[in-house]
Swiss-Prot record:
InterPro entries: Glyco_trans_28_C (IPR007235), Glyco_trans_4-like_N (IPR028098). The lineage of its organism: Archaea, Methanobacteriati, Methanobacteriota, Stenosarchaea group, Methanomicrobia. Pfam families: Glyco_tran_28_C (PF04101), Glyco_transf_4 (PF13439). Gene3D superfamilies: Glycogen Phosphorylase B. Its EC number is 2.4.-.-. GO terms for molecular function: hexosyltransferase activity. Belongs to the glycosyltransferase 28 family. The keyword Cell membrane does not apply. It is an enzyme of class 2 (transferase). Keywords: Glycosyltransferase, Transferase. This is Uncharacterized glycosyltransferase MM_0582.
Length: 376
């Protein structure tokens, strides 16, 4: 098969799981092309693959840890143009794929349908209208149109691939609101992780080690500061901070001896394997990677970001970690870290998810799913 993968560039989770799929399809002898933009395209290239430049689409905006729906709508609308759609049409015509996989990139779906190429949506969020609730008249009207558009997409694609654990273990279950009419087109693949646990190297950290990752958005730096202050309160717990592309570690002064800043890394998996707990935002991709490596999570979701808040709530309710806040002070952060280390039930549950991720083998499951549907 000739596979074309379109990647949404807002959040590295989209890129990570598409790289996992690309690796799997290539290993099985299929032809793979990537379409990406921004730092997602850069990560694809740093991993060793070529990528075609595609127009950016959805733009997320916020400040001081709060998601700004109005600003996000404005920046997204400014990005959209007929010329961008025509560019995607030409790319599909040039590459002539047998199947298009579109991870959160909706222009790719519409263009594939225009070219009559089978297209599958990869996504973990299906209640986008929640972003627009109680945000004023403008946002409310926008939410109505957004819901209609997404409902069209979900009902018109050839299939929906959900890169999460199947129910009842799904982290995205509060974000999963799809009409029963499309149930037959939904496939829970399990986590799509670039590196399996057995294949990953392991960083030789002093233990216990807390891995703190801020993802890709610079306005999350407030969490770094609070976690850094928490680290100063107990030197017997070690911390490793992986910063996102927009964070300069040099901005943090007076770093204690039990803290290490690594800057941004394209390969976080040895860090996961060498750690005992992950502190992250509420993004689905990092949560899946952490759980697939058996790690409990302290999740700091972006405020007013419904999807992340739902993910964090599920983590707490299921006993995989705790939902935190940008207002959580360092003393309470430390108390939560100690609680997770002292209560073995957290690690027992997340180790079970690590074992389940190995059994499900998400990338291979997607490959087999598509090979079955598109034989010959």
């Amino acid at each position: 098969m000739k596979i074309l993968l379109f990647i949404c560039g807002e959040g590295l989770g989209h890129t990570g799981r598409c790289l996992a799929l690309g690796k799997e399809f290539l290993a099985a002898g299929h032809e793979v092309n990537f379409g990406a933009y921004g730092y997602s395209k850069g990560l694809v290239q740093k991993t060793g693959y070529s990528a075609y430049e595609i127009p950016s689409e959805i733009k997320l905006a916020g400040e001081a840890g709060t998601f700004d729906i109005r600003k996000s709508i404005k920046e997204t609308l400014n990005n959209l143009s007929p010329s961008g759609f025509r560019k995607i049409l030409r790319l599909i015509e040039k590459l002539d794929p047998d199947v298009v996989l579109s991870d959160g990139y909706y222009t790719g779906i519409l263009a594939a349908q225009k070219r009559k190429v089978p297209v599958y949506f990869i996504g973990h969020q299906f209640n986008m209208e929640e972003f627009f609730w109680k945000k004023g008249l403008f946002a409310g009207i926008a939410g109505i149109f957004v819901k209609r558009f997404y409902n069209y997409v979900f009902s018109s694609v050839d299939g929906i691939i959900v890169p999460d654990y199947p129910l009842p273990y799904s982290v995205n279950r509060k974000n999963f609101t799809i009409s029963r009419a499309v149930n037959d087109n939904i496939f829970f693949s399990g986590p799509l992780i670039r590196c399996r646990y057995q294949e990953a190297g392991e960083k030789a950290f002093k233990r216990p080690n807390v891995l703190s990752t801020i993802g890709a958005f610079g306005y999350r730096a407030a969490v770094f500061r609070n976690v850094l202050e928490a680290a100063k309160l107990d030197p017997s717990i070690y911390y490793t901070f992986i910063s996102g592309p927009e964070i300069d570690p040099e901005q943090f002064s007076k770093v204690p001896e039990n803290v290490e800043f690594t800057g941004f890394t394209e390969n976080p998996f040895p860090y996961y394997k060498g750690s005992d707990l992950v502190i992250t935002a509420g993004g689905h991709g990092t949560i899946m990677e952490s759980l697939a490596f058996g790690l409990p999570i302290l999740s700091f979701p972006d405020e007013k970001h419904a999807e992340q808040e739902n993910n964090a709530s599920v983590l707490e309710e299921a006993g995989y970690g705790k939902r935190m806040s940008y207002l959580t002070p360092p003393e309470v952060i430390l108390a939560c870290i100690r609680e997770i280390f002292e209560d073995e039930n957290y690690s027992k549950k997340t180790r079970r998810l690590m074992e389940l991720a190995e059994v499900l083998d998400g990338p291979a499951a997607v490959r087999k799913f598509l090979e079955e549907k598109h034989r010959g």
